[in-house]
A protein has these predicted regions:
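Loop/turn elements at helix/coil->beta-strand transitions in domains of secreted/extracellular proteins
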Residues: 63-67, 95-99, 125-129, 155-158
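N-terminal "domain-start" segment that seeds a small globular fold
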Residues: 22-60
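Nucleotide phosphate-binding site architecture
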Residues: 60, 77, 109, 160, ...
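Structural microenvironment flanking redox-active thiols in thiol-disulfide oxidoreductases
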Residues: 80-124, 131-140
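Short active-site neighborhood of thiol/selenol oxidoreductases, capturing the structured segment around
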Residues: 57-80, 86, 100
Length: 189
């Protein structure tokens, strides 16, 4: 009986560990979820960090705009692969009502230094707002588990789509266009 209990505990722990590893290693290949109607939740606000390329932003002040939140870190290979696409969306859709916010949640100590982040933002040609998240407050509020992770918020500030890893760019762009075409909330008309 004791052997059965111990075996059950060991198997359960192994499955939990394997699930965590799968999330970690499958993230580069991408996984997405679209939220509709009552499934969508209001996005947590962005905790205070140091803002680059912008004054501090609050999501409530962005109601009426579609918001893309990109969790990244400059040492992440997959994040660097997604940057050209994210930057092109900023150029293409910002005039139509899209706001992109980068949330820089560092993995390594040198990524925590704001001067290093500023240098990388300049080098990478990022022109949209970036907020530092050295203490992972925003990361934890959004329950992020891997870099890069992208959230799309509708004009009411609700999470309508999220994607982990690279890829699914056509679906993301389709949803950006769909959300931009939706009517803004009544209080913003």
């Amino acid at each position: 009986m004791i052997i059965g209990i111990v075996a059950g505990i060991v198997i359960g722990a192994a499955l939990t560990y394997a699930t965590g590893l799968a999330k970690l290693f499958l993230a580069p290949y991408g996984s997405s979820a679209e939220y509709k109607g009552s499934e969508s939740a209001t996005a947590p606000d962005l905790a205070t960090g140091e803002w680059i390329n912008s004054e501090p932003l609050k999501l409530a002040d962005l109601r009426g705009r579609v918001v893309l939140i990109d969790f990244w870190t400059f040492g992440c290979y997959n994040c660097r692969n997604t940057l050209p696409i994210v930057k092109s969306w900023n150029d293409r859709y910002r005039p139509r009502g899209l706001t992109i916010i980068g949330v820089h949640s560092p993995e390594f100590d040198d990524e925590r230094k704001v001067e290093n982040l500023r240098r990388e933002i300049t080098s990478l040609g990022i022109r949209y707002p970036v907020v530092t998240d050295n203490d992972y407050q925003i990361w934890n509020a959004y329950k992020v588990e891997a870099w890069p992770t992208v959230f799309l918020l509708d004009k009411q500030g609700r999470i309508r789509w999220m994607h982990v890893g690279e890829g699914d760019y056509k679906e993301a762009e389709r949803l950006i266009q769909k959300l931009l075409a939706e009517e803004p909330p009544l209080e913003n008309k």
